[in-house]
Amino acid sequence: MLRTGDMHPDTLSRRTVAFVNIAHALDHFVLLIYPTAVIAIAAERGLDYGALIGLATGAFVAFGLFSLPMGWLSKRLGRRNLLAAFFGGCGVACLGISMTATETGFAVWLFMLGVFSAIYHPIGGAMLVTHARQLGRDLGWNGVWGNLGAASASGVTAVVAATLGWQAAFAVPGLVCLAVGAAFLALVPEDGEGNAQRKGSAGVIPVSRPMVLMGIFALAIIAGGMTFNVTTISLPKVIDERLGLALPLALTGSLATVVFVFGALMQLAMGRMVDRFSLPSIFVGISILQPMGLGLAAMTTGVPMLAGLVMAMAAIYGQVVVNDAMVARYVPAEHRATAFSVRYFLGFTTSGFAVPLIALLHGQGGFAVVLAATAAFGAAIFLCSISFLMVAQPRLNAGNVAAE
């Protein structure tokens, strides 16, 4: 086994960032297998979509709830060890889902998948900021990896489920998680100190009213958690019902993948902008696209609906980069793991209600109602961004600026 002393810090940082990026892709991939596979499961077993999708509620609640203690655990167990547990736990949970035959089994294993998936964002986010060479660029590329995981989940799951069965759609990613985890343990010996003081690392931005600013940001995170999860979870079924074409499952999943790809492109753009422009101004510009895109998707079908989803998904995933940059730029280094834990706890725990909300609203009026409600959450984010811009005035005393 390698030791930190045997490895140049640059090598350790490059390897750490590489595995953090892969973990981000796998995190979003494994959580979004079920929303596509459930279409095949429902058809095979003759069960209602609303009832089956509701079994994933525990996974998404756990995804947020168990992110909260990760900052505390990282100080005791180490970030590297927790990320290794992420790889192993997600792999075992996916294999468990592939072998279950009951609705209770689905609920239990999906819950376990949510527990281990909760490790990534607070731990991976803190590791990325620590080892990043250029914050905005590395956050942008990390976002792309996560988005590609989400994007490929729909298409890959649809193809595998249609050709090999839905069980294989869980088993194959489970084995991949275990293999990547073994490689991570072998190639990344410890946490390391990273690139915290190197070129491209920005200092913490001092503000005059930090508590008010964080309160506004918290509200935006909660609303953003709803738009993110409702949209990503329901996307394959939205396309299936509202595109206006009778498409096979594989093609439906592929179209969902195309929509996610636009989100990845926006994340690259956001990464570049974070290194060049004011974060509050970027926040306003990206957030207005969410209610616009979701509103268009709610009011239309066919190609216009697809265009609205593209706009919304680009904004939703671009917002993720902005949010992570906010934590990196407004929170001191020693508190970042805890800050990332709270950030994802707020976003993902609240959005754990996304699954029952989808089921409830879909039963009341289809996806037009689901998308309209999501657009309302998007409008709330835009209002928060305006408030954030007004409050985020730096302190006048430059001597108080802290370095990361």
Residue locations for each model-derived region?
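Structural signature of the two symmetry-related core transmembrane helices
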Residues: N81-L95, S281-L296
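Conserved MFS/SLC helix-loop-helix module at the cytosolic interface between two early adjacent transmembrane helices
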Residues: L65-A101, V274
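Helix-loop-helix hairpin linking two adjacent transmembrane segments in secondary transporters
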Residues: N142-P189
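A late C-terminal transmembrane helix in Major Facilitator Superfamily
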Residues: Y330, E334-G365
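Interfacial helix-cap and linker-helix signal at transmembrane-aqueous boundaries
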Residues: I41-A42, L73-S74, V159-L164, I239-D240, ...
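Central cavity-lining transmembrane alpha-helices of secondary-active solute carriers
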Residues: T57-G71, T257-A269
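Extracytoplasmic gate region of multi-pass secondary transporters
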Residues: Y34-P35, L213-L265
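Cytoplasmic helix-loop-helix junction between adjacent transmembrane helices
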Residues: W109-N147
